[in-house]
Amino acid sequence: MQKLPQTLIGSVLLGACSLAQASTVAEVFNGEMLGTNQRYFESIAGIPRESFGDEHKFRVQGCNITATMTEGSVSTLRLELTPQCQADLTQFVGDYAPPPGQPLTFGAFEQASGGGLSYHADCLSGCGNSYDPSVYGHWEGPRAVDFMEVLLEAVQVEDAAIEAADIWRNQMIKTMGEDWVMDRQFNCNRQFDPVARQALNAVQVTAVTVGQQLRVPGC
């Protein structure tokens, strides 16, 4: 039996891997992938680079995508945003999302969805230096989009995000006191959402998570 050249074998294996790997982020980060089983999802997204419990991290077209598996099926999808990695949220919630092809901001999503985001944060006061905390806008969709939820996130590293968080924090400290803010009571109280909404309006989102029963920071 004639042996195949090593270069040919390598080409066949590379071709098989290419077929298994998604060609675009759009093939992985879309509403049709929610609810699919893990085996099918990985046939499109490829093999995860890292796994932590139910969370599996993939690299597609240079973009970081995290899929959370619940009982073997995809329950949430998270995309880290960069100038090269942009989310088309219309593939999840239709016209409730801003049109693709433009930077995603909290204000753009508020306008497209008709509002109703609740605002949360990992920490706003006494956070320390062990990590960079994020601020979040959480949206719960109507029946028309099967109650889909969207979680917008902005890490507090860019000046705009830091300044917006400062405005939000300072107003709450002025009204409720610093202990109230340090205890993150704002995560369970919607009184200051209008302040956060105005402050974060033009802040660009750094990651977006879509699914149902999303986890948000508590108090």
Predicted features along the sequence, with ranges:
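Generic anion/oxyanion-binding catalytic loop in active/binding sites
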Residues: 9-11, 30
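Short N-terminal edge-element motif at the start of the domain
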Residues: 23-98
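Non-cytosolic coordination micro-motifs
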Residues: 44, 50, 80-219
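Bacterial N-terminal signal peptides that target proteins for export
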Residues: 1-9
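N-terminal signal peptide c-region/cleavage motif recognized by signal peptidases
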Residues: 15-17
